[in-house]
Amino acid sequence: VPLTFFPKKVPGLQQAFRLKDGAWRMNLTVEALGQSVQADVFHLYSLKAGAAYGSVLMNFFVVGAPANEWRISVPAGIGNIDVSGQNVGRDWRREGDVVVVPLSRPVLGAGTILLTFEQPMCARGGDISPGEVRPLGVQGERGYVQVVSPLQVNYDISRSEGALLKLDPSELPAEFRLLSSAPTLAA
């Protein structure tokens, strides 16, 4: 029986069966599934004189077993880090190239955090590698990268690897385009 047709709502109901007569029997094999975490990530980089300012919004979806912490890869050249979000206190820490974010309550289902940072750059320009701030220990990651600047700058995408697709700025979802009023350089 489809769960939507079950006459009484029961929290946590996963299977329902209908009996056609009194002589019935069933064997059920049950297997506990491990934790699976999917991440939707939006990287926003704003280029200004002497620095690139980054905001990385991470939406996690956890099934199987609750998550007690988030682990995020952050390159060494990135500083002035701040982390905020659901169930996130001030006790996050940096361990080398990893930011460890303990959660005040374990998360099962959806969880969101925002990691902001600065990456120093020469006032005349320099190199940045958007997308290097990434969630660790996830089974799947997808998302968007947007680079904006209120300044007039020349830029060149010197290298693009993997499953990264260049987008026209109008192809970014509207909810992400609204996060910056500066012109988009690359998406």
What is the predicted function of each stretch?
Residues V1-A187:
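Extended non-catalytic domains of envelope/secretory-pathway proteins
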